[in-house]
């Protein structure tokens, strides 16, 4: 659901640079405490980038492809759920929302690239119980 993703948290605020706190999840705490998991996760990030799947340019091309598929449905969507309506208060049109998604992808991709470059894959402290 777009209003709870791509830098949105359901209240129409732009949260593009807020880091996701994996420490809030017991599962992620335990996984990230394992050096083998951190190593595999980092390797997967780099592999998917090298294959072009997670390259920023590829992600943006994918957004553009979805745009061309969805454009014909936009009028019906806004007829059903008008911009700045009672349950969704936002004046952005389809094009503005796509630009926000692309902006978010650029910011998040850079954050993740830095995160994985700086990730320690050596031993970590045991996950808290």
Predicted ranges, named:
Residues 2-129:
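Middle-to-C-terminal accessory/interaction subdomains
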